[in-house]
Amino acid sequence: MSARMFVLCCIWFIVAFLWITITSALDKEWMIDGRGINNVCDVLMYLEEDDTRDVGVIMTLPLFFPFLWFALWRKKRGWFMYATALAIFGYWLWQFFLRYQFCL
C-alpha cells in the first residue's frame, strides 16, 4: 500500500465519520440531561415524530461508493482500505440502526 492510498483512506475515514455523526443525530438529542430524559431510548419514546434517520441513511450511502470503485472496478485491494471500509460501515450501522435496537 502506498503512502498516498494511506492518506486517502485516512481522509475518507475522517470525512465519513463526521458526515455520519452529523446526519445521524436526532433533532432533540440535546434534551438528554440525566434528570427526565436519560438516554437515546427516552428521546425516541417521547419524540417519535421527529425521527429523521431515514433521510440520513440515504444521504450517507454515497460514502461507500469510493470503496466500491477502488475495490471492485480498479482492483486496488489492500488490507488498510478494507479495514477503513469495515470501520466506516460498522460506525454507520451503529449510528443508524444498532443503538436503537435495544430500546423496548
From Swiss-Prot:
Location relative to the cell: Cell inner membrane
Keyword Nucleotide-binding among record annotations: no
Domain of life (superkingdom): Bacteria
Periplasmic side: 27-52, 99-104
Alphabetical UniProt keywords: Cell inner membrane, Cell membrane, Membrane, Transmembrane, Transmembrane helix
Entry's Gene Ontology cellular component terms: plasma membrane
Pfam families for this protein: DUF2645
Membrane topology summary: Multi-pass membrane protein
Membrane side Cytoplasmic: residue ranges: 1-5, 74-77
Transmembrane stretches, start-end: 6-26, 53-73, 78-98
Full protein name: Inner membrane protein YjeO
